[in-house]
């Protein structure tokens, strides 16, 4: 049960971090330096 719980928590943290990273990279107001590279 402990291994299953660790696997579930790891998957949740992985998807949450992907979601937050996607929001930060797609939001120009959060990341104004991105306009300089384009």
UniProtKB/Swiss-Prot annotation:
Subcellular location(s) per record: Plastid, Chloroplast thylakoid membrane
Family: Belongs to the PsbI family.
Keyword Chloroplast: yes
Organism name: Phaeodactylum tricornutum (strain CCAP 1055/1)
Organism domain of life: Eukaryota
Name of the protein this chain belongs to: Photosystem II reaction center protein I
Statement: the UniProt record of this protein carries the keyword Membrane: yes
Topology term for the membrane: Single-pass membrane protein
A biological-process GO annotation: photosynthesis
InterPro entries given in the database record: PSII_PsbI, PSII_PsbI_sf
Chain's role: One of the components of the core complex of photosystem II (PSII), required for its stability and/or assembly. PSII is a light-driven water:plastoquinone oxidoreductase that uses light energy to abstract electrons from H(2)O, generating O(2) and a proton gradient subsequently used for ATP formation. It consists of a core antenna complex that captures photons, and an electron transfer chain that converts photonic excitation into a charge separation.
GO CC annotation: chloroplast thylakoid membrane; photosystem II reaction center
Keywords noted in UniProt: Chloroplast, Membrane, Photosynthesis, Photosystem II, Plastid, Reaction center, Thylakoid, Transmembrane, Transmembrane helix
Subunit structure: PSII is composed of 1 copy each of membrane proteins PsbA, PsbB, PsbC, PsbD, PsbE, PsbF, PsbH, PsbI, PsbJ, PsbK, PsbL, PsbM, PsbT, PsbX, PsbY, PsbZ, Psb30/Ycf12, at least 3 peripheral proteins of the oxygen-evolving complex and a large number of cofactors. It forms dimeric complexes.
Primary location recorded for the protein, binned into one broad class: plastid
Segments traversing the membrane: 6-26
Lineage of origin: Eukaryota, Sar, Stramenopiles, Ochrophyta, Bacillariophyta
């Amino acid at each position: 049960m402990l291994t299953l719980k660790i696997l579930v928590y790891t998957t949740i943290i992985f998807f949450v971090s992907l979601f937050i990273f996607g929001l930060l990279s797609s939001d120009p107001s959060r990341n104004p330096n991105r306009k300089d590279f384009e």
